[in-house]
Design a protein with these regions (language model features):
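Non-heme Fe(II)/2-oxoglutarate
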Residues: 1-100
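A short glycine-rich, His/Asp/Glu-containing loop-to-beta-strand
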Residues: 97-116
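A short beta-loop-beta micro-motif enriched in histidine and acidic residues
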Residues: 105-106, 119-133
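Short, conserved beta-strand element in jelly-roll/cupin
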Residues: 113-115, 128-143
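Tight coil/turn sites that cap or link beta-strands
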Residues: 116-118, 159, 167
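Short beta-strand His + acidic residue motifs that chelate non-heme Fe in jelly-roll/DSBH
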Residues: 120-123, 145-146, 164-177, 184
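A short hydrophobic beta-strand segment most commonly corresponding to one strand
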Residues: 132-137, 161-163, 177-195
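A short beta-strand-loop-beta hairpin characteristic of the jelly-roll/cupin
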Residues: 137-157
Length: 218
């Protein structure tokens, strides 16, 4: 793993990326393990029913950023990252990640859950406006909305992957009687295949920006 990575700086809030995968089988795996999920960012800010389960990272219950666990850099944290026992229980998810998702060095890979009636309080996760965070919608009820701080909203269609600009304030409200399951993938690299896929999506969706080399952040 390199200590730096190409990041795409953009004012766009998100773009859609199309992957060739069966999201329904992955959704079944995410849902089947619900009893194993851990509360995410407990006490950090207002949220209800926000939980996570780690497939790759510092441990099944280590759902937060590596800084929360005493590491000084992503490079040091990466040395201790591994596929967890949860990954062993998710063959369809692993097939997608290892054979279809263009990444050689994974950071955190997590199932994320917002329970029925739950919400994620408004927050932002990056000081720089980056299109980098991959959020794959697996189960997203109709009355569950991603809300931007400026008032815009986004319905994240099941089976669709989104590259999110989490520099901007955002929140999630699940006003339904069904749980919301997503798969979030953090890449520690920017492979040629990723850039090809990403650049094609930007061109199709008229999204502009520029690549910059930064120290790996996640």
């Amino acid at each position: 793993m390199n200590k730096t990575k190409e990041y795409f700086v953009s004012t766009a809030k998100h773009i859609k990326i199309n992957f060739n995968f069966n999201f329904e089988t992955i959704a079944q795996e995410a849902k089947r393990l619900k009893k194993l999920y851990h509360i995410h960012r407990e006490g950090c800010y207002d949220h209800k029913g926000w939980k996570s389960l780690v497939l790759h990272g510092l441990g099944e219950s280590h759902t937060d950023h590596w800084k929360s666990y005493g590491y000084d850099s992503s490079f040091d944290a990466y040395k201790d990252m591994k596929w967890t026992s949860i990954a062993d229980q998710c063959p369809n998810t692993m097939d997608f990640l290892l054979n279809y998702f263009p990444c050689e060095h994974f950071g955190r890979v997590r199932f994320m859950l917002v329970e029925a009636g739950g919400h994620i309080g408004e927050h932002c996760d990056s000081r720089v406006p980056l299109l980098d965070n991959t959020n794959i919608s697996l189960i997203n009820p109709e009355n569950c909305i991603w809300q931007w701080g400026d008032g815009d909203s986004l319905f994240m269609h099941p089976g669709q992957a989104y590259i999110m600009n989490i520099h901007y304030p955002h929140s999630v409200y699940n006003k339904s009687d069904e749980d919301r399951y997503h798969l979030i993938v953090h890449r520690l690299d920017c492979t040629p295949k990723w850039k090809e896929l990403f650049d094609e999506a930007c061109q199709e969706q008229n999204v502009t920006g520029k690549y910059h080399e930064y120290e790996v952040l996640v």
